[in-house]
Amino acid sequence: MAIAEEEAALIEDSVSDSVDHRGLPAGKSSTGGWRSAWYIIGVEVGERFAYFGIGSNLITYLTGPLGQSTATAAVNVNTWSGTASILPVLGAFIADAYLGRYRTIVVASLIYILGLGLLTLSSILILMGLSEQRQHNRNASAKPFFWVNILFFCSLYLVAIGQGGHKPCVQAFGADQFDVGDPKERISRGSFFNWWFLSLSAGITLSIIVVVYVQDNVNWALGFGIPCLFMVMALALFLFGRKTYRYPRGDREGKNNAFARIGRVFLVAFKNRKLKLTHSGQLEVGSYKKCKGQLEFLAKALLPGEGGVEPCSSRDVEDAMALVRLIPIWITSVVSTIPYAQYATFFTKQGVTVDRKILPGFEIPPASFQALIGLSIFISVPTYERVFLPLARLITKKPSGITMLQRIGAGMVLSSLNMVVAALVEMKRLETAKEHGLVDRPDATIPMSIWWFVPQYLLLGMIDVFSLVGTQEFFYDQVPTELRSIGLALSLSAMGLASFLSGFLITVINWATGKNGGDSWFNTNLNRAHVDYFYWLLAAFTAIGFLAFLLLSRLYVYRRVDQV
């Protein structure tokens, strides 16, 4: 009798579909929750410190030691950041289908550290090579050797590969530490996404302030070496918390591949495409009602096919439908995210041309102004949690305050507004350069304070809190349970594709406006460029994307995760 009561208590204390580090059912009191989540948040702080230590000032390195033009450097930055944001789809696939999130994080971290180490080595070789060239040839415009360039870009893309495996799995693994079947832990999981973003913003801000200063005022080798050290510390912290984690059962034991299950739905539906979907006793009543009228092509996978084709289960069909419904939302997210790619490229290059003195005798590096994004997030997240959400709950009578799609939509509006503000500030900068006769003096400092750029950086932080966090929570919540790494990867891939599109737009516009001897919108001399026209174009794109998003969000049917 006592044994039976002990077993019942153990079952009541355990978390369904999760095990501990020994492979036993995960206990609520001994694993998971905020205790484990803070280890994982700490890991992400270190990783974001490393990533932004490289990415935030990359355009300065490309146009400086590597000697690239502004347009070429902007395209290279967008291509790299786009690749780094697309690769999480592959990393999530490997995690969800084969390795599991924990093992994928460890392997990806090792690749990440290798890339950062080689990046540091390449920067040492580049700086040594440039120094030797200038001593022997007295050529101030010397460029690094080709093979050293190759090493630099290979190491840079190794970092992207490491980030591709690390990024979607760490956040999903953190969210896995909360049991959605427990009402209190479900609320905590919602807060996790907000505090996750606030904490990693601390890592980003610290990186932008410290690492960028070292890169601009000490040397690039040390500026790349510090992020490598932080990534080593992040991996050590992650391994230290191993015994406290809850592991999804798929990470510790074999199970049906979710990709195979859902892929089979599309295959069977295609084979049954000529069959008529009618309730003739072949379908269960519940399955028929759920599928009737929405994506009926996939619902045909529920029918027994010719030649003895086994029908798919209603759960598999519903999971496939959930993924398909996400595609239109994902596409509009891509369009509205294009403006986000500009802060690490043109915002930074514009900052080089203006007065950057913020204190007597102290001139802030232009890339360090990105720290204002983190400051905005520090203010916006607590305001969102403690002020905005309670007011929204009073008005809407919903526990969540606003829906995830409403949160994303608010971010889209702010994104369009941000491009309008950026365009107006750039018009002011060009006008000031013209008034003081500095149009043909690109190296001269325009008598305009860098504080003019504050609003567009603060708006970027607010966009993150609404659009980026909302998108991550939405895709994590709405994909099938076994594919949550893929869900987060989809939100990241929207940013990646947006970076590629931004690079493509820059290439096309640079060619179209710069041919026949004209001044390109992205002229290396920014005083003769028209980046403001580009910002107006992006504001229009984002507004159109928001209108499409409004229509699609009204048609979207939320997937009830708590019932799956």
Swiss-Prot record:
The chain crosses the membrane at residues 49-69, 80-100, 110-130, 145-165, 192-212, 220-240, 327-347, 358-378, 408-428, 450-470, 486-506, 533-553. SUPFAM superfamilies: MFS general substrate transporter. It comes from the Eukaryota. Gene3D superfamilies: MFS general substrate transporter like domains. One of its GO terms (molecular function) is tripeptide transmembrane transporter activity. It is found in: Membrane. Belongs to the major facilitator superfamily. Proton-dependent oligopeptide transporter (POT/PTR) (TC 2.A.17) family. This is Protein NRT1/ PTR FAMILY 5.16. It comes from Arabidopsis thaliana. The gene is NPF5.16.
